């Protein structure tokens, strides 16, 4: 009889433990809601700069702020014009759909200010020339979060002004040069950023 009571108690204990484990398993229990992230712009080295971003979520407002800095010359010089300088940008993300579980995840709209400042060798006479441009962009994107891994995909466009480079590329945005037309006041930008949350 004691053997059967012991088996019954053991069976009850195991079944209660398994039920409790199943009921406590939710995606939220496996996915923490991190409010900060550090990101690198994927393949930015191939365009002549290294870009690092920091993002902070404001979960009560379904928003986040993101600042990005870029060291121009830390990468492959695709135009062979030896650029040296920096880019600064700030974007404020407005997440478009309810996502109460993960503050940094989802589709978003982002207005963004960009300032690009660098010297390069001019294609016309190889003299050192200053490219000093600013831009105001509107971007749309999607940010994916899995545990601590983050991937950010976005594109957008807007208005630019300043002293443009003869390549039209400003290490953060490009001036319009498609469809047989060039416009130094239309800026386009797109990117993929990969990072970690904490």
List PLM regions with ranges.
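Outer-membrane beta-barrel translocator domains and adjoining extracellular loop/strand segments
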Residues: 52, 78-82, 119-127, 164-172
């Amino acid at each position: 009889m004691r053997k059967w009571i012991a088996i019954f108690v053991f069976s009850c204990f195991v079944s209660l433990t398994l039920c409790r484990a199943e009921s406590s398993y939710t995606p939220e229990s496996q996915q923490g809601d991190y409010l900060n992230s550090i990101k690198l712009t994927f393949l930015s080295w191939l365009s002549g700069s290294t870009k690092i971003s920091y993002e902070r979520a404001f979960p009560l407002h379904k928003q986040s702020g993101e600042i990005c800095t870029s060291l121009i010359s830390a990468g492959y010089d695709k135009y062979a014009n030896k650029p040296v300088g920096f880019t600064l940008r700030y974007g404020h993300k407005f997440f478009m759909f309810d996502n109460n579980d993960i503050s940094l995840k989802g589709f978003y709209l982002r207005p963004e200010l960009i300032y690009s400042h660098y010297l390069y060798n001019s294609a016309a006479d190889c003299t050192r020339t200053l490219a000093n441009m600013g831009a105001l962009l509107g971007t749309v994107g999607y940010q994916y979060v899995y545990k601590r891994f983050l991937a950010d995909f976005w594109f957008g466009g807007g208005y630019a002004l300043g002293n443009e480079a003869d390549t039209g590329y400003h290490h953060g945005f490009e001036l319009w040069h498609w469809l047989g037309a060039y416009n130094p006041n239309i800026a386009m930008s797109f990117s993929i950023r990969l990072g970690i949350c904490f």
